[in-house]
A protein has these predicted regions:
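N-terminal helix-loop segment corresponding to the beta1-alpha1 unit
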Residues: 1-188
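Active-site-adjacent beta-strand anchor residues
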Residues: 19, 97, 198, 245-247
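Glycine-rich beta-alpha junction loops
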Residues: 47, 119-121, 197-204, 240, ...
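Short, surface-exposed loop/helix-turn segments at secondary-structure junctions
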Residues: 53-57, 211-221, 269, 323-329
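Conserved Rossmann-fold dehydrogenase catalytic segment
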Residues: 122, 150-159, 181-201, 217-228, ...
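Oxidoreductase and adenylate-handling cofactor-binding alpha/beta cores
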Residues: 166-191, 207-216, 257-264
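Aromatic-enriched alpha-helical interface/lid elements that frame and gate functional surfaces
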Residues: 225-227, 231-307, 311
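A glycine-rich dinucleotide-binding beta-alpha-beta segment and adjacent secondary-structure elements
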Residues: 298, 305-329
Length: 329
């Protein structure tokens, strides 16, 4: 059963969030507020947010990524003082990115709640360093496990580090706003949340610190789309399209084998272990690929849903506007 929540019944419908950062990280934090019903206003400089120029660009020059990040938001051009703009004065929360903050402004200049996003945090030895998604991937150690076994690590493309940073900024600022509401009349003054993109991304590799502390060897790079301990894992071709597969526990493995008619693999006792399956990838994967090639991605996806298998159908550009889950969202 699916229901649509009216905007005035959404959890954040009475919040005004103002984004003056204009980066992927600040925009993603604002996007999550907008998704939950908040009124989000982009206070943009005369040249517009930097996200407006991120490729790919549509025929009319619009950035597809910008459109995704800023759906259901309002944009206002600010040519005068940011601090005295009516949106800032009325805001429940101002989201900013230190990397795009004008030199004439400081984080402490605002008299309202602030979520200050930065690459490395507002304090510490890296605070003044310039950052990038690639540098975050390198510093967290994420790149160590990506790439061919006999080659250099591969730098992930896209803006994954900033998206995770924006998600963390959203979670943290929601907590502060909730604390203000619960405190009632006794609440303290405005807060400033120091949201470090680097710190947020440590969630991906913090287990490595524990392994190092216990003198355990770091996992070796296993090759393209090989990440211990999960297998099968990857985006694979089907008869007519591609399917994302993430199978970990024994019940998922049994259901996946049933879906593809590979019952003998499901019955193999040692393959109840995901790591054992990964060790025998040379035996298992050719059979999986052959079975996938005999079915459509759409058919496998919907049948797999009913069997509680973690599958993701990869739509073509032509299908994006007709995929049911996207239409509903």
């Amino acid at each position: 059963v699916t229901t649509r929540t009216p905007i005035d019944s959404s959890p954040f419908h009475d919040l005004l969030i103002v984004d003056i950062g204009g980066t992927v990280a600040s925009a993603y934090a604002g996007k999550l507020y907008a998704d939950y019903g908040a009124r989000v206003v982009n206070l943009e400089p005369s040249e517009g947010f930097s996200t407006r120029h991120i490729a790919p660009l549509l025929d009319n020059g619009t950035s597809a990524i910008h459109a995704y990040l800023h759906a259901n938001k309002q944009s206002v051009s600010c040519t005068d003082s940011v601090l005295t703009h009516p949106a800032i004065l009325a805001a429940d929360l101002v989201i900013l990115d230190v990397s795009t903050l004008p030199t004439s402004l400081a984080v402490d200049d605002f008299d309202t709640n602030v979520c200050a996003i930065s690459w490395y945090g507002l304090t510490g030895p890296y605070a003044g360093f310039r950052g990038s998604d690639a540098s975050i991937h390198a510093l967290t150690g994420l790149m160590h496990g990506i790439g061919h076994t006999d080659g250099p690590p591969i730098i992930p493309t896209g803006y994954q580090a900033q998206v995770i940073g924006g998600l963390s900024a959203f979670n943290g600022s929601v907590g502060f706003l909730l604390g203000h509401v619960l405190s009632g009349p006794e609440r303290s003054g405005a807060f400033c949340l120091d949201a470090s993109i680097w710190e947020a991304n440590m969630c991906l590799t913090d287990i490595g610190a524990a392994m190092s502390f216990n003198n355990q060897p770091m996992p070796k790079r296993l090759g393209i789309n090989r990440f211990a301990p999960t297998y099968p894992l990857g985006i694979w071709p089907c008869k007519d399209g591609w399917l994302g597969v993430t199978v970990l526990n024994p019940s998922q493995w049994a259901a996946f084998c049933q879906l593809l008619g590979l019952d003998d693999l499901a019955m193999e006792s040692k393959y109840q272990s995901s790591m054992a399956r990964l060790d025998d990838v040379g035996i298992i994967e050719p059979r999986i690929l052959k079975a996938l090639s005999e079915h459509s991605a759409k058919d496998l996806f919907y049948r797999g849903q009913g069997m509680r298998i973690p599958l993701a159908r990869v739509p073509t550009m032509e299908e994006l506007f007709t995929v049911d889950q996207y239409v509903e969202r």
